[in-house]
Amino acid sequence: MKNYRKYAKQYFLPKEVCRDWVARDALDEAPVWCSVDLRDGNQALVDPMVVEEKIEMFQYLIKLGFKEIEVGFPAASQIEFDFLRHLIEHDMIPDDVYVQVLTQCREELIARTFESIQGCKQAIVHIYNSTSTLQRDVVFHMDRPHIVDIAVKGTELVKKYAADFPGKIVLEYSPESFTG
């Protein structure tokens, strides 16, 4: 039984947790759904969608009533960059729809992401970084405060680029593969 420690708690809860919603009978308002069907990323099909197919899918998602649509990872994919530029340059994004773009917390990727959304009226910039114990130890060779610093710096960069952006920017952050 020498390996029992590997099952130790590897997560933490926020200091002040409010879970009043658990006691409610029903939701007060409908949730906001964000479609992520257009991002190929590392979940790509063997033959990923081309710009024309993405346009067709985007128009279908609009028809279905989605108000938030993740259009991809434009800093990492030229197809997704070109697709987003096409939507903006051809005024295909309705005024009540937010396009969402995904990027890692790295300055060159955040800069390229903001380049991709120039001319967009409103966008959600979704940043992320790896936070799992295994990845921070084995891949990044960093301790927890350094990983937190990556997220903080990414947030500061989005804030910096958003200050010069003529449209509305919403920041979204996610830990990637959170396990500790």
Predicted regions and their residues:
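Glycine-rich, proline-tolerant flexible connector loops at the mouths of alpha/beta enzymes
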Residues: K67-I93, V97, V101-L102, I127-V139, ...
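Hydrophobic or amphipathic alpha-helical targeting/insertion segments
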Residues: E107-T133, P145
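Helix-rich catalytic cores of soluble enzyme domains
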Residues: T133-G180
